[in-house]
Amino acid sequence: MSGSMATAEASGSDGKGQEVETSVTYYRLEEVAKRNSLKELWLVIHGRVYDVTRFLNEHPGGEEVLLEQAGVDASESFEDVGHSSDAREMLKQYYIGDIHPSDLKPESGSKDPSKNDTCKSCWAYWILPIIGAVLLGFLYRYYTSESKSS
Ligand code: HEM
């Protein structure tokens, strides 16, 4: 009966109220994946989890498309449709938490720029052998033409 679970923002007025966002709930992908029915339907858009159960029959795009994305990452499909900013605003109502950081794909690339690095080195891997081959070609021609002329 201690009741000491009250949130800090309820009474705290000592100027430290900026950390409200720390109370984010994290869900694992496997938990979201279980909510894939008409009874309970969650989906993930850009690393955020949305409970769209009560939105199903309100969705202008139909409940079928939502069911197809049930329990999985729907970011791509959501973007492909080109949803309006109104639609994006609506997302907030259904937001229930974030995907656990260790389940996040390196999609947003801010933490893991290794994709760019690989691309850069890809380029180097391509260009170096080509430069080598061209140089060898020139050397070969230089030597063969020299031996012809003398
Ligand atoms: C919670 C997430 C979603 C919300 C709040 C939402 C909201 C909306 C809204 C408001 C519209 C009307 C058009 C607009 O304003 O852009 C719409 C249309 C549509 N949505 Fe969604 N949507 C969501 C998720 C999805 C997903 C995951 C798909 C998967 C493919 C999808 C497919 C569509 C389609 C195909 C239309 C077009 C309907 C038409 O043009 O006739 N939506 N959605």
From Swiss-Prot:
Residue positions where Phosphoserine is found in the record: 23, 37, 84
Residue ranges listed under propeptide: 1-15
Occurrences of domain Cytochrome b5 heme-binding (ranges): 24-100
GO MF entries: heme binding; metal ion binding
Presence of keyword Iron: yes
Residues recorded with modification N6-methyllysine: 39
Entry-annotated residues carrying N6-acetyllysine: 34
Residues that span the membrane, as ranges: 123-140
InterPro entries found in the cross-reference section: Cyt_B5-like_heme/steroid-bd, Cyt_B5-like_heme/steroid_sf, Cyt_B5_heme-BS, Cytochrome_b5
Region annotation (Disordered) ranges: 1-20
Amino acids binding heme: 59, 83
Xref: PANTHER family: CYTOCHROME B5, CYTOCHROME B5 TYPE B
Subunit structure: Component of a complex composed of cytochrome b5, NADH-cytochrome b5 reductase (CYB5R3) and MTARC2.
Function statement: Cytochrome b5 is a membrane-bound hemoprotein functioning as an electron carrier for several membrane-bound oxygenases.
Designated name of the protein: Cytochrome b5 type B
Gene name as annotated: CYB5B
